[in-house]
Swiss-Prot record:
EC number: 6.3.5.-
Superkingdom, taxonomy of origin: Bacteria
Main function: Allows the formation of correctly charged Asn-tRNA(Asn) or Gln-tRNA(Gln) through the transamidation of misacylated Asp-tRNA(Asn) or Glu-tRNA(Gln) in organisms which lack either or both of asparaginyl-tRNA or glutaminyl-tRNA synthetases. The reaction takes place in the presence of glutamine and ATP through an activated phospho-Asp-tRNA(Asn) or phospho-Glu-tRNA(Gln).
Top class in the EC scheme: ligase
InterPro entries noted in UniProt: Asn/Gln-tRNA_amidoTrfase_suB/E, Asn/Gln-tRNA_Trfase_suB/E_cat, Asn/Gln_amidotransferase, Asn/Gln_tRNA_amidoTrase-B-like, GatB, GatB_C_1, GatB_Yqey_C_2, Gln-tRNA_amidoTrfase_suB_CS
Keyword Nucleotide-binding applies: yes
Gene3D superfamilies reported for this sequence: 1.10.10.410, GatB domain, N-terminal subdomain
Any single GO BP term: glutaminyl-tRNAGln biosynthesis via transamidation
Similarity comment: Belongs to the GatB/GatE family. GatB subfamily.
Catalytic activity from the UniProt record: L-glutamyl-tRNA(Gln) + L-glutamine + ATP + H2O = L-glutaminyl-tRNA(Gln) + L-glutamate + ADP + phosphate + H(+); L-aspartyl-tRNA(Asn) + L-glutamine + ATP + H2O = L-asparaginyl-tRNA(Asn) + L-glutamate + ADP + phosphate + 2 H(+)
Name the record gives this protein: Aspartyl/glutamyl-tRNA(Asn/Gln) amidotransferase subunit B
GO molecular function: asparaginyl-tRNA synthase (glutamine-hydrolyzing) activity; ATP binding; glutaminyl-tRNA synthase (glutamine-hydrolyzing) activity
Protein keywords: ATP-binding, Ligase, Nucleotide-binding, Protein biosynthesis
Length: 476
C-alpha cells in the first residue's frame, strides 16, 4: 500500500519591535541573563499588562502579506500551564478570536506547478523564557519572556517534507521583506514545529499525528519530517497503534525522540484575559498598514525575470533576502549586464559570504564597485579569472576594482604577437602534448592553454590563448 504524508506547520516569528508585547523592556538579543525584565514580564503580583500597538500593526501587516482576512474585533486569552520558563504560570495569547484568519502561501513544485498552502490563523502571543540545563541544575533566563511573537498556523495541505521546506522558505522571505521579523533561525527568532501523520494515497481520513519540535533549520525540518514519515509508515504497515504525542528532533542521532503525550486544548484551560480590553481594528488602520507593505519577494522575482531577462531560478534565489535583491538591482542598473551580475552574486560572492559568515549588508564594497568589476571584464581589461582575484581583494579592503588592477598590474594582455611567442615556446617544450593531440586527445590542448596562462601569470586573454594554441597545434 502506498502512503502519503499530511503535514501542517506552526511557525513562531519574533517581531522586530523595540520593546516587549506588554511592557517597556527591551527586546534586544544577547543581554546578560535576567537584565531585560520588569514586574510585568515576570508576572509579579499587582502588575498590569499594556498591549504594544506596534505588535498589532505588525500582526496586521503579516496577515495582509499572507493573504489573510483581518479580524476587526479580537481579544487576548490566557493559556494556563506550569513550566519554569513561564513566570506567570500562564501565557497571554489568542485562542478563539485571533488577529488573522484564512490566508495562503503559494509555492512552486519541482514540476513547475504552483500549489497553495492554506494558513488557518495568525495569532499574537508572548514568548517564554529560556532554560539552560547544566550538570548542577537548570537555570532560567527571563530576558526573552514577553518578547512579542506571531504564530502562523498552516492548514494540513503539505504532502512532502520538500513542500514543507519550500513553504517555510517562502514564509521567511515574506516576513523578512516586510520587516516584521529578522527571521534569524540561529538566534531563535524564527522557530518551526511540525505536525505529521500518514494516510493511504487517495484517502481523505488523516492518521494519528505527531508534533515535532527542535527543527531549527531548513535541513533539520526536512530530515525530521522524512524520518517521522518513515516511522509512521513502518508502524502502520506492521499494524501497530500510533498515539498522538510530542517528539523532538535529535540532530546528533538523526532521530525523533518522545517528549510527552500530546496535550489537548482543554488541558490549557483557555479563558479571556481580563486585564486587557477587546481589540477593535478599524478599516482605516488596516488600509494605513497595507500602504506600508513593499513589493513582496515573489512579485520582485517576477519583475526581475520580465525586466532584466534573467532565469526564473536566478530571480528566486536573488529575492530570498531583500538586501540581496536590492544589491542585484542597483548593480545591474550600473553594469548593464544582469546575467553577469546574477552570476557573481549567486556564485563567488555568496561563496565568500558563507565562508566568512557575513551578510550582504556587511560587504565592504557597494553595487557601483561590483558594476565596475563587471565592466572591466566585459571590456577585456581583465580576464574573468583575474576578476575573481580582484573580488577577493575587494572583500578584504573595500577598494575599487580599478585601483586594485592598477596597483597590482593586473591589466589583461591582449597583444596577439606577444602571446603567440609564449604559445610557440610552450608547444616547443611540450612535444608529447602535441603528439597526444594528434592521437585524438583533445584535452592535451587544455593542458597547453593552462601552461600559457601560468607563464603569463594569468594576464593573457584566455580567448586569444585558446585560439592561438589551437591554430599552432593544428599546424604541427
Amino acid at each position: 500500500m502506498d502512503f502519503e504524508a499530511v503535514i501542517g506547520l506552526e511557525v513562531h516569528a519574533e517581531l522586530s519591535t523595540n520593546t516587549k508585547i506588554y511592557c517597556g523592556c527591551t527586546t534586544e538579543f544577547g543581554g546578560q541573563p535576567n537584565t531585560h525584565v520588569c514586574p510585568i514580564c515576570l508576572g509579579l503580583p499587582g502588575s498590569l499588562p499594556q498591549l504594544n500597538k506596534r505588535v498589532v500593526e505588525y500582526g496586521i501587516k503579516a496577515g495582509l502579506a499572507l493573504n489573510c482576512s483581518i479580524n476587526k474585533v479580537c481579544r487576548m486569552d490566557r493559556k494556563n500551564y506550569f513550566y519554569p520558563d513561564c513566570p506567570k504560570n500562564y501565557q497571554i495569547t489568542q485562542d478563539e478570536v485571533p488577529i488573522c484568519r484564512d490566508g495562503y502561501i503559494e509555492i512552486e513544485l519541482e514540476n513547475g506547478e504552483k500549489k497553495k498552502i492554506g494558513i488557518e490563523r495568525i495569532h499574537m502571543e508572548e514568548d517564554a523564557g529560556k532554560l539552560l540545563h547544566t550538570n548542577a541544575g537548570t537555570l532560567v533566563d527571563y530576558n526573552r519572556a514577553g518578547v512579542p511573537l506571531i504564530e502562523i498556523v498552516s492548514r494540513p495541505d503539505i504532502r512532502t517534507p520538500e513542500e514543507a521546506t519550500k513553504y517555510l522558505e517562502k514564509l521567511k522571505s515574506i516576513l523578512s521583506s516586510i520587516e516584521v521579523s529578522d527571521c534569524k533561525m540561529e538566534q531563535g527568532s524564527l522557530r518551526c514545529d511540525g505536525n505529521i501523520s500518514v494516510m493511504p494515497k487517495g484517502s481523505e481520513k488523516f492518521g494519528v499525528r505527531s508534533e515535532i519540535k527542535n527543527m531549527n533549520s531548513f535541513k533539520a525540518l526536512e530530515k525530521a519530517l522524512s524520518y517521522e514519515y518513515d516511522r509512521h509508515v513502518e508502524a502502520v504497515t506492521k499494524g501497530e497503534i500510533l498515539e498522538q504525542e510530542t517528539r523532538r528532533w535529535d540532530e546528533a542521532n538523526s532521530v525523533t525522540v518522545l517528549m510527552r503525550s500530546k496535550e489537548k486544548a482543554n488541558d490549557y484551560r483557555y479563558f479571556p484575559e481580563g486585564d486587557l480590553v477587546t481589540l477593535n481594528i478599524s478599516d482605516e488602520w488596516i488600509e494605513e498598514v497595507r500602504k506600508t507593505i513593499p513589493e513582496l519577494p515573489h512579485e520582485k522575482a517576477e519583475r526581475f525575470v520580465n525586466e532584466f531577462r534573467i532565469p526564473k531560478y536566478d530571480a528566486m534565489v536573488l529575492t530570498l533576502t531583500m538586501d540581496m535583491a536590492k544589491f542585484f538591482e542597483e548593480t545591474t542598473l550600473k553594469s548593464e549586464d544582469a546575467k553577469a551580475t546574477s552570476n557573481w552574486l549567486m556564485g563567488d560572492i555568496s561563496r565568500l559570504m558563507n565562508e566568512k559568515t557575513i551578510e550582504v549588508k556587511d560587504l565592504k564594497f557597494n553595487p557601483e564597485q561590483l558594476a565596475e568589476l563587471i565592466k572591466l571584464i566585459n571590456a577585456g581589461t581583465i580576464s574573468n579569472n583575474i576578476g575573481k582575484k580582484v573580488l577577493d581583494d575587494m572583500f578584504k579592503s573595500g577598494k575599487s576594482p580599478k585601483d586594485i588592477v592598477e596597483e597590482k598590474g593586473l591589466v589583461q594582455n591582449n597583444d596577439e604577437g606577444a602571446i603567440l611567442e609564449v604559445v610557440k615556446k610552450i608547444i616547443e617544450n611540450n612535444p608529447q602534448s602535441i603528439e597526444d593531440f594528434k592521437n585524438g586527445k583533445k584535452r592535451a590542448l587544455g593542458f597547453l592553454v593552462g601552461l600559457v596562462m601560468k607563464e603569463t601569470k594569468g594576464k593573457a586573454n584566455p580567448q586569444i590563448v585558446n585560439k592561438l594554441v589551437s591554430e599552432e597545434a593544428n599546424k604541427m
